Design a protein with these regions (language model features):
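Hydrophobic alpha-helical transmembrane segments of membrane proteins
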Residues: 1-86, 98-248
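Glycine/proline-centered hinge or cleavage motifs at structural transition points of membrane proteins
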Residues: 94-95
Length: 248
């Protein structure tokens, strides 16, 4: 980690200089009130969101939305963007190969997502204790939250590489991508939506299988197959955008 100058720059800007602290403040200042209000205010739905039994669901879904959204923005360098060296400068002036730049971006994204979940952990664990959620379900939730936040944010890295010199284009893409994908997954096939899938797991409900070519495909297999394809496409697109930008 110490030998990668690109990664070290991101760590210095976010944690040494403190430019990234605002991200974690935003996450906590939104998550904490939602959790407390969902416990003490009247329920929104008597069957799904009633009282303490659903507290962990509310907290987990809110954490999912916040971590995915802010991870995409961090990957897109929307915080303290003026402090980061450009990709071309790293490649041409500092001699950093494309692989090292991509590796540093992915490692820092992993670090950011892990830290975000670590900060949210006390609230999630407290909600799980009140809702009497089994430890195995809590551990599975943390794994899914990391998987979704990291996977979706890789498209932020793609936007950064493709439109590095056009900050407004990147910001519009990230926000449009986030909301469009959420809505489309609800309309096309509900189990593909991470919110619906997470709620189904926490509620111990199973989606009906999808019949394709005379074979019934389990919803879980379709969900993870679709997401692995989605994330794999993002990683390939990120590499392609880096090569395109750095070879101009």
């Amino acid at each position: 980690m110490n030998s990668n100058s690109v990664l070290r720059e991101s760590i210095d800007i976010f944690f040494v200089e403190g430019h990234g602290f605002a991200v974690y403040f935003y996450i906590l200042v939104i998550l904490a009130p939602v959790e407390f209000l969902s416990l003490y205010l009247p329920s929104l739905d008597a069957q799904m969101w009633s009282g303490s039994a659903s507290l962990f669901k509310v907290t987990a879904v809110t954490t999912l939305l916040l971590t995915v959204y802010f991870a995409m923005r961090v990957a897109n360098q929307e915080f303290a963007s003026w402090r980061f060296r450009t990709l071309k400068r790293w490649h041409r002036e500092n001699g950093q190969p494309i692989f090292a730049i991509a590796q540093a971006q992915l490692l820092f994204l992993s670090l950011h997502v892990a830290l975000s979940l670590l900060l949210c952990a006390p609230l999630l664990i407290w909600a799980a204790a009140i809702a009497r959620t089994p430890f195995s379900m809590v551990a599975l939730t943390f794994g899914l939250l990391f998987f979704y936040a990291w996977g979706y944010a890789t498209w932020g890295l793609f936007a950064l590489a493709l439109w590095e010199r056009r900050a407004e284009s990147r910001q519009v893409f990230i926000r449009s991508f986030f909301f469009t994908l959420t809505i489309l997954s609800l309309l096309v096939y509900l189990p593909l939506n991470p919110i619906a899938f997470l709620l189904a797991i926490l509620s111990r409900q199973e989606f009906p299988p999808l019949s394709i070519a005379g074979y019934n495909w389990p919803a879980g297999i379709l969900h993870f197959s679709g997401h692995f394809l989605f994330i794999g496409s993002a990683l390939l697109a990120h590499q392609w955008a880096l090569r395109k930008e750095l070879r101009r």
